[in-house]
């Protein structure tokens, strides 16, 4: 028996080295939105188009507004290192205003559900192809059934009868193929159109429409609930009492090309909000003024001076402070999204949200409230006034041998030990 040499398979493996952790902080400015890698740990504001839920992509955050003291990441979703499941806090945004001012379009633009002209053309073409397949299938079934029925009748036909029959079938097929074709008569209309232009096709809201988005601010999750209300009065009477419950932000929406919708914010909508707000919910609510359709600036009927006047009038007449006023356009990319992000950040910084995290408390203690009230009572200067605390200097009992003693001036004896 021949001796065979046995070999062992020893694979030299390198010791496990932990992956380095980047020490440099993540910058949250506009310059690295496009340069961010998809595998970044921070969150992004660029979700996929969702149908019934929120599908999110990782990425970098955005820069905070200049009024905020801290800088941090802001994203739609993110992954935390902790395995503990923490329920996100709720932020309720209520959009109110007249009909046809663009409340629904603003929400769809924030949720990235508005299609461009090229995307809509592809969608219409795909839908037409599906309809054409169903029609062709139905036509084939009709022809087959007709042939079967012809066989059952066992009737002999002349060549003229068959020619007439096939002409009728071809005529029916041409009519069904031309019906609903999106390319007929539209080539000349869309020849010069921009394929990246956002197409806004919305219907009037009946009752309310609710959409949600999950955002991540400084590794803390917030469930943003956007309430789209009907501008017509006949759809509101039944839902007004429960509409303003636990609302954190009231967004007064108007059309800059319609002065009547702007006046309704002052005469109708702010009055309705104050009548239906409870005293407890009003403490955690903030008001914002948003003008839509700024892309139609040539047809503007509401000027910036009118907006400033209304803000001052609301504060004097109703005692309501407008926390911010914006002008947006749903046809411009990311304009509505940046505006909504600034509103959400303002609410979080001021504690205007429903806190579902038991580990974090936003309740202000009595001592802090007392010191804050004392500060506002004593200081009559604006916010740039700096108050310094002065300490009373007490005489030290120890002797400093490097400095002359005060008792020298009194001609007293000094003894240094």
Swiss-Prot record:
Self-association and partners: Interacts with MYO2 (via C-terminal tail domain). Interacts with YIF1, YIP3, YIP4 and YIP5.
GO cellular component annotations of the record: cellular bud neck; cellular bud tip; endoplasmic reticulum membrane
Keyword field contains GTP-binding: yes
Pfam family, any one: Ras
Subcellular location: Endoplasmic reticulum membrane; Bud tip; Bud neck
Gene symbol of the encoding locus: YPT11
Protein task: Involved in the positive control of both endoplasmic reticulum (ER) and mitochondrion inheritance during cell divison. Required for the MYO2-dependent retention of newly inherited mitochondria at the bud tip in developing daughter cells.
Keyword Ribonucleoprotein in record: no
Organism: Saccharomyces cerevisiae (strain RM11-1a) (Baker's yeast)
Region Disordered: start-end pairs: 1-34
Family: Belongs to the small GTPase superfamily. Rab family.
Lipid linkage positions (S-geranylgeranyl cysteine): 415-416
Protein's name in the database: GTP-binding protein YPT11
